[in-house]
């Protein structure tokens, strides 16, 4: 069972991102949509990232930044970001420090084989670094719209 982080202070984290940037939550003066996804360039992850891309300007109007996180390498992230024209950065978490801080590593099963993977999850963090809303086990369809609604109604 995942720990519920809603209403709690966000874990402080930093990491290497696309565009040769380093992200530090402590230095962000905006709200943040932090979405975790299993793997670059896979169907669900591509659709989810495109949906956030298409709504990005609306998130910015509400002083909210978006960061995508997966265990993929920076090179993989750069290719994915470029191919999908993503206007926001992707954080590379190969050692799973950020994934573990948000408790999104789960035992999964595919074709009868069990493995540890990223549970598609999103966290809405306000300017005070408090987690206002969390979504775990996300279904991609309509998710970015639901997150935008939360930004509009909860922040």
Predicted feature locations:
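Chalcogenol-based redox active-site neighborhoods
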Residues: 1-155
């Amino acid at each position: 069972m995942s720990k519920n982080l809603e209403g709690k202070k966000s874990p402080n984290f930093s990491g290497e991102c696309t565009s040769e940037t380093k992200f530090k939550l402590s230095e962000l003066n905006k709200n943040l949509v932090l979405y975790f996804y299993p793997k670059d360039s896979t169907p669900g992850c591509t659709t989810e990232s495109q949906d956030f891309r298409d709504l990005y300007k609306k998130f910015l109007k509400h002083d909210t930044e978006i960061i995508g996180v997966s265990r993929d390498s920076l090179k993989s992230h750069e290719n994915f970001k470029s191919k999908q024209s993503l206007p926001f950065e992707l954080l590379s978490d190969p050692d799973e420090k950020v994934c573990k801080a948000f408790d999104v590593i789960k035992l999964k099963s595919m074709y009868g084989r069990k493995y540890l993977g990223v549970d598609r999850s999103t966290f809405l963090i306000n300017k005070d670094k408090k987690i206002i809303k969390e979504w775990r086990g996300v279904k991609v369809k309509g998710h970015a719209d639901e997150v935008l609604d939360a930004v509009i109604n909860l922040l």
